[in-house]
Regions:
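Generic recognition of flexible, low-complexity loop/linker segments
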Residues: 47-49, 57-61, 71, 101-105, ...
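Mg2+-dependent endonuclease catalytic cores in nucleic-acid-processing enzymes, primarily RNase H-like
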Residues: 78-202, 221-225, 229-239
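Histidine-centered active-site/metal-ligand motif
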Residues: 206
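ATPase catalytic-site recognition across NTP-hydrolyzing enzymes
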Residues: 1-62, 67
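Short beta-strand scaffold segments in enzyme catalytic cores
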Residues: 69-75
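A residue-level signal for conserved active-site and pocket-lining positions in enzyme catalytic cores
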Residues: 25, 71, 115, 184, ...
């Protein structure tokens, strides 16, 4: 019996959100109904933190509003495997403060290729006549505009979560990013659109949205829309 042989496994199960705990601990698989990322498995997709090799590319991706700044740092190894190695969540920050927090949370000497942000930051602010992207740039943080097709973005996240032929997923998350891990497990399907994730409760959407911006930009060219299934689109894209 796995649980008798490995008490740590039982303790790990008790730390899961209620629906995951009921399913994996007690066999109540109906509890997972509605989970958007039902394929997300902490045993596969969460790993202990480790020292990142200096030749790995690093990126930032964030979701921003006064209600919450959610920033993720992602490293990509030469084989294309992605690791979310840092997270920062903080509310009530104006643009200049948000830019400073993201820069301050980035380790000294850490070279970040680009910072990915959603296209709504390129809308003009009435008070200044400038875009929020311009305000971020003035605060020292230039941004890369991502696509915002929600379905394509979620499909890209699911593609990264999918294990390859050797059983290795395209995305892992350091255990030191508990907020993202929890929010991914808590996200539900939109009851009106099964291909989309629910926008409520809003508090759990910020981290997954930031991951969506990264995944869509990493797998798909910004601004383009996928045609057919994501895998077919990728094959055509990289042919």
């Amino acid at each position: 019996d796995l649980m008798a042989a490995n008490p740590d496994y039982v303790r790990q199960l008790e730390l899961l959100p209620e629906d995951k705990r009921r399913a994996h601990r007690y066999g109540d698989w109906d509890a997972l109904a509605g989970a958007y990322f039902s394929e997300f498995d902490p045993g596969i997709h969460v790993c202990p933190p480790f020292s990142l090799p200096p030749d790995w590319s690093r990126y930032r991706a964030f979701d921003y509003g006064l209600d919450m700044l959610a920033c993720l740092w992602v490293a990509v190894n030469p084989a294309g495997k992605c690791y979310v190695y840092r997270e920062h969540f903080q509310k009530d920050l104006v643009v200049s403060q948000a830019a400073r927090r993201m820069l301050d949370c980035t380790a000294p000497g850490e070279r970040v290729v680009c910072t990915m942000a959603p296209p709504d930051l390129w809308s003009r602010v009435k008070e200044s006549g400038k875009t929020m992207a311009a305000l971020f740039a003035e605060a020292g943080l230039g941004l890369l505009r991502t696509g915002n097709n929600r379905q394509a973005g979620w499909m890209a996240v699911k593609e990264l979560l999918r294990p390859d032929s050797s059983g290795e997923p395209g995305l892992r998350i350091f255990g030191t990013c508990p907020r993202l891990i929890s929010d991914l497990q808590s996200l539900r399907h939109d009851p009106r659109n099964p291909n989309d994730a629910a926008r409520e409760p809003h508090g759990i959407t910020h981290g997954p949205d930031a991951l969506r911006y990264f995944a869509q930009t990493y797998l798909l060219p910004p601004g383009d829309e996928p045609v057919g299934e994501l895998e077919a689109y990728r094959r055509a894209l990289w042919a």
